[in-house]
Amino acid sequence: MQALDPSASREMRELLFMSGRLDAVLALIDTANEEDPHQVLLDGIPVASEWLYGQRMSGWLSRLEPEASDVLKIAARGQHVRRWMIPRSDYPMDRAGYLKWRTTLYRFHADQLEPLMKAEGYGEAEIQRMRALIEKRGIKTHPEAQALEDVICLVFLAFYFDHFRVRHDRSKVVDIVRKTWGKMSERGQAHALELPLAPDALSIVEDALGG
């Protein structure tokens, strides 16, 4: 029987370690998000809303970027980690209040993820890259930032658009879709066009793209 190459053995150990620490961080994110008091139904079963959002983010990321880095996978899964702790209602219900809320959330989510990554052996460079992704720095200039933005937009259109559009004025929804479309890459837009949208939703998308 041929002996295992020592260098291959070291590489295998490193790969197992890297996989193990990623799984550990994702599990910690899931545990945190399972505390979300807001429940939604998944196949008739109540689950934590932000836990489900994290799973959907990871699902779309695996479709777009099968070889995504650990940092990108963590940023996708942790995009809304413990979001319910900073509700929109804590800020003025105007554009300035919305922007302040969003900026606060970016820092909050990054602050939640940093100790989880440190605990599992991720270095400062990886943590800072995570922060840049969560804080939406580098969209349109950095491939990972753009990939994450594509995933965010696709998850919104695939899972949350129907609920959103019936709660807001059509002109506002058209404007939101137009802005969402502009954030996506051509690849993301192509995937969006393949989504099985309801006729009313598709009509809004068509108006947004034609406007």
Descriptions of predicted regions:
Residues 2-104:
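Acidic/His-rich, divalent-metal-binding segments that scaffold phosphate/diphosphate chemistry
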Residues 5, 17-21, 44-48, 55, ...:
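Divalent metal-dependent phosphate-bond-processing catalytic cores, especially two-metal-ion Mg2+/Mn2+ enzymes
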Residues 70-88, 109, 113, 132-138, ...:
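His-Asp-centered metal-binding catalytic motifs of divalent-metal-dependent phosphohydrolases/nucleases
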Residues 89-131:
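Helix-adjacent hinge/juxtasegments
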